Amino acid sequence: MTSPPTFGLSKSERLYLRDEINTVFGEGKAFVVYPLRVVYRLGSEHRVAYSSMLVSVAKKRFRRAVKRNRVKRLVREAYRLNKHLLNDVLQERQIYATIAFMVVSDELPDFRTVERAMQKSLIRIAGNVPSSALKNE
């Protein structure tokens, strides 16, 4: 039986180490669910949290920092509210995920659009989690 979802977003659930970020972008798989481009990597190396994430918004798309911060806040909030869609599967199969979300839209998206894209992307990643733990990575 899985525990009830926790809706916090702690530091252990954020991807911030340069080596881990390079590994995600170097070895990860990518897909687009508009307005998000998602790059993720699944692994069996033990971490504190089953999934860790980062959000990136290009300065080229949103020149003003206020808008970039708003979009990042929307993506983080959508992830925080829907991460249980992925974490339940990861916890059951003892797999760990690192995920990068990049905004590809040129216009400021609303929360409903971001949340739908987040749900679709987390369900898609959960569908790609292997049934047995990855032993040789």
Swiss-Prot record:
Keyword Nucleus appears in the UniProt entry: no
Catalytic reactions on record: Endonucleolytic cleavage of RNA, removing 5'-extranucleotides from tRNA precursor
EC code: 3.1.26.5
Annotated keywords: Endonuclease, Hydrolase, Nuclease, RNA-binding, tRNA processing
Keyword Nuclease: yes
Record-level GO cellular component terms: ribonuclease P complex
Single GO biological process annotation from the record: tRNA 5'-leader removal
Family named by the database record: Belongs to the RnpA family.
Subunit organization: Consists of a catalytic RNA component (M1 or rnpB) and a protein subunit.
Function noted in UniProt: RNaseP catalyzes the removal of the 5'-leader sequence from pre-tRNA to produce the mature 5'-terminus. It can also cleave other RNA substrates such as 4.5S RNA. The protein component plays an auxiliary but essential role in vivo by binding to the 5'-leader sequence and broadening the substrate specificity of the ribozyme.
Protein name per Swiss-Prot or TrEMBL: Ribonuclease P protein component
Originating organism: Porphyromonas gingivalis (strain ATCC BAA-308 / W83)
